[in-house]
């Protein structure tokens, strides 16, 4: 019987809208909005209750090492930075791994540049097809020449589809971006290699501009010669 009772069509009870006199106060809160707001309120209320309970049971003499190894910034605990976390040898090993990763990136980019350049070079320097014509007299030669000129003019750059033009322009932009990326990576690799060499033992000094034979914007160092055993 319950299924029959539920099958009877009933009037849909709609929630009332905001009265005309209170339209200036905005939309009237619906029941589903009230449920969301009430859940959020009770959740915050429960969190505050638990925090108050923790504070009431707190031992004033308790101590954790995190109390001296961290500090609060805007009410949030932040761990203090460790000054000498790694030794010199460990730092050297980490930098060597980073240099290997950068070198791998340079080699990968150079391969992509080579592949892209060869593809664009083939598009720009496409060899024309050869066709041999046989003519009986001068008039026929002139006619064939005019026909070839018309055909070559119709196959010019203006008749290339715009889709192909856009794709070629995009490939040239990609090639230029990859070349710039390789330059940046090579500069970064050179800087890291220099810093690694400067960390090694041995007396060294930075050369002045008048001592450098090949002028460069980068710093140049000279190591003192050591006698090999």
Swiss-Prot record:
Coiled coil: none
Keyword match Nucleus: yes
GO (cellular component) term, any one: nucleolus
UniProt KW keywords: Nucleus, rRNA processing
Subcellular location per the Swiss-Prot or TrEMBL entry: Nucleus, Nucleolus
One Gene Ontology term from the biological process aspect of the record: megagametogenesis
Any one Pfam family match given in the protein's UniProt record, by short name: Utp11
Keyword Methyltransferase listed: no
Top-level taxon of the source organism: Eukaryota
Location of region: Disordered: 1-23, 199-229
Record's function text: Involved in nucleolar processing of pre-18S ribosomal RNA.
Similarity field: Belongs to the UTP11 family.
Assembly behavior: Component of the ribosomal small subunit (SSU) processome.
UniProt-recorded name of the protein: Probable U3 small nucleolar RNA-associated protein 11
Natural source organism: Oryza sativa subsp. japonica
Lineage of the organism: Eukaryota, Viridiplantae, Streptophyta, Embryophyta, Tracheophyta
């Amino acid at each position: 019987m319950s299924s029959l009772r539920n099958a009877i069509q009933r009037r849909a009870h709609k929630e009332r809208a905001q009265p005309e006199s209170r339209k200036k106060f905005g939309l009237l809160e619906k029941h589903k909005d009230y449920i969301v707001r009430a859940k959020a309120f009770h959740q915050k209320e429960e969190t505050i209750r638990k925090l108050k309970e923790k504070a009431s049971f707190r031992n004033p003499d308790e101590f954790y090492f995190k109390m001296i190894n961290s500090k609060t910034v805007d009410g949030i605990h932040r761990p203090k930075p460790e000054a000498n976390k790694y030794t010199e040898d460990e730092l050297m090993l980490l930098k060597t791994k980073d240099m290997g990763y950068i070198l791998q990136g340079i080699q990968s980019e150079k391969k992509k540049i080579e592949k892209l350049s060869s593809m664009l070079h083939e598009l720009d320097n496409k060899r024309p097809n050869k066709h041999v014509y046989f003519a009986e007299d001068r008039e026929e030669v002139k006619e064939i020449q005019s026909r070839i000129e018309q055909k070559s003019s119709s196959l010019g750059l203006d008749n290339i589809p715009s889709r192909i033009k856009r794709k070629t322009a995009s490939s040239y932009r990609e090639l230029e971006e990859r070349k710039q990326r390789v330059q940046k990576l090579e500069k970064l690799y050179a800087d890291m290699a220099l810093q690694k060499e400067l960390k090694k033992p041995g007396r060294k000094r930075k050369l002045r501009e008048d001592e450098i034979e090949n002028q460069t914007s980068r710093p140049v160092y000279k190591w003192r010669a050591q006698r090999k055993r």
